[in-house]
């Protein structure tokens, strides 16, 4: 994968997160902001989830209250380089915990 392909895929990931939050009808308020290629989800309790791209490594990084995760693209899924879990699994787990209610991005 070259840098432009990586950015195209990361942009698509960011857009999917934004679209799914826009259509989410949960009770909690989750704000989504993109600044300089970094996507920040802010929760009512003041906690945040930070998602950013690491261009030199062609990785997506996820920072949550539970810890930090690095994802490599394998096929058509972003997979954690430590646990083997998908990006969506770990994002949903963290968002659910931080929102205090079930959050789904799929």
Curated annotation (Swiss-Prot):
Record has Iron as a keyword: yes
Keyword Transcription set for record: no
Pfam families membership: Frataxin_Cyay
InterPro entries: CyaY, Frataxin/CyaY, Frataxin/CyaY_sf, Frataxin_CS
Domain of life: Bacteria
Keywords: Iron, Metal-binding
GO biological process terms on file: iron-sulfur cluster assembly
Family note: Belongs to the frataxin family.
Function comment: Involved in iron-sulfur (Fe-S) cluster assembly. May act as a regulator of Fe-S biogenesis.
Name of this protein: Iron-sulfur cluster assembly protein CyaY
Species: Salmonella paratyphi B (strain ATCC BAA-1250 / SPB7)
């Amino acid at each position: 994968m070259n840098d432009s392909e990586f950015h195209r895929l990361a942009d698509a990931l960011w857009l999917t997160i934004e679209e799914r939050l826009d259509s989410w009808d949960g009770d909690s308020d989750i704000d989504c902001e993109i600044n300089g290629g970094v996507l920040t989800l802010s929760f009512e309790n003041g906690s945040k989830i930070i998602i950013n791209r690491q261009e030199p490594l062609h990785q997506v990084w996820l920072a949550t209250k539970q810890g930090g995760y690095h994802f490599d693209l394998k096929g058509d899924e972003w997979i954690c380089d430590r646990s083997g879990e998908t990006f969506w699994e770990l994002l949903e787990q963290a968002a659910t915990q931080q929102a205090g209610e079930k959050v789904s991005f799929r």
